[in-house]
């Protein structure tokens, strides 16, 4: 996945036409579109290929099962046209290996959740986040998911993985995270959802956040 705008759109809507219209409006400001269960369950896997006409698609299924089931899920996701899948790390190395094995067959990527962005993400996941990051590094994942709502945690994860893995960081906007803060902490991409797709003008909202990110990268913050 190419790093240009450093922003990923989390497209958590449930209407096909709305999803495609938003993607058409904001594609120039995002490096990828992340879709999850809400949109896929409402419209079917076919929406992945439709959205892929605008930007690479990350399937946020937080895959978390035994290895064989993980293989089946990832195979379906990549066959549908996704460029990457998000998997949980707490299921262990063999389950993660299964996801990475299928991804490699398709020449696609796997992101591993180290810690989620909501307040409850600190309850049980934070104590094991660093171990998950080390496991993802050893397993050869493409990147990690770390919370934009807690930039210090992003910085900690970055110290563990160095420059060997990428970090995508959800929680910017509606959850309280600030794009420039998390980029400064070491994230490669910020993930933004409601602040864009619920805006009166998704295109303008995306443009403003993209400008904030680029200003941080230029050292203007």
UniProtKB/Swiss-Prot annotation:
UniProt key word Ribonucleoprotein: no
CDD domains: OMP_decarboxylase_like
Job description of the protein: Catalyzes the decarboxylation of orotidine 5'-monophosphate (OMP) to uridine 5'-monophosphate (UMP).
Name the record gives this protein: Orotidine 5'-phosphate decarboxylase
UniProt keyword list: Decarboxylase, Lyase, Pyrimidine biosynthesis
Provenance organism: Methanosarcina acetivorans (strain ATCC 35395 / DSM 2834 / JCM 12185 / C2A)
Family of this protein: Belongs to the OMP decarboxylase family. Type 1 subfamily.
Assembly with partners or alone: Homodimer.
